[in-house]
Structures are given as C-alpha cells and as structure tokens.
Amino acid sequence: IGTLLYNFASARSIISRTFSESYFYNPYDVNPHYIDKYHESAHLGDSPKSVYASVQCNYTKCNITKTLEKIDNSIYILGGEAEQDIDLIIKEYTKCNPAIESSTIPNTKHLPQIENPEEVSSTVQMFFN
C-alpha cells in the first residue's frame, strides 16, 4: 500500500500542478523537461521514497536556531520575491543572526535559480565581489 500511495503522490500530474501552483511565478514558464526530471528522480535510485518520507514526516524541518546564532561566516539568503512568506522567513533568519544578508529575485517564486538564472547569477556575483 505504501508504494501505491507514494506513486500517487509523486505522479506526473501532481508534480506538474505543484510546479504551476507553488514553484513558478508564471505557470506558463514551466518547462515539461523540469516535470520529467522531477518525476524521474522520484523513481530512481536505491531509495527514492526516502526524501519524500523525510519531508512528509517533517524530518527536514530541524531547528537550526542555536547553530545559526554561533556562525561567524558570511550567510546569504536568496529567495523568490513571490515565495509565500519570504519576508517573514528572512526576518526569522536575521533574528537568529543579524549578519545574515538577503536578496529576493523579482518575478520568481520557489525556484528563482530556474526561473531567472541570469538575475540569480548577477546577484550572487554582486555578493561575492
């Protein structure tokens, strides 16, 4: 039953809807190649269900507050401007460590590196120069 449920959850139609509704600012920019790759990676390897199970069971939501407070290196957050609660997320990180710097990429959502790679590259280069 577990494999059946996993196959439903990682179906191409579910991945496509997630990209259109949650990952991309403009749903018409979703390239079918991205859907193919995500679908393929959900079914390849020795344990493709591991990441899905970890996300569903909230194992990927570790509290890193104490670690962030102690970091004395540069930390830079880059997010999509239309990502839900991005300003709040950045604020929470900077509350832990005021040295954290951030930028948002306009007209992008969850995957700014795919939606606008030129702007992401420009922003990253600006930070490291």
Model region roles, listed by residue range:
Residues 6-70:
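Conserved alpha/beta-hydrolase catalytic His-Asp/Glu region
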Residues 21-26, 53, 82-89, 122-128:
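A general structural signal for short secondary-structure boundary/capping elements
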Residues 98-129:
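Catalytic active-site module of serine/aspartate enzymes centered on a nucleophile-bearing elbow/loop
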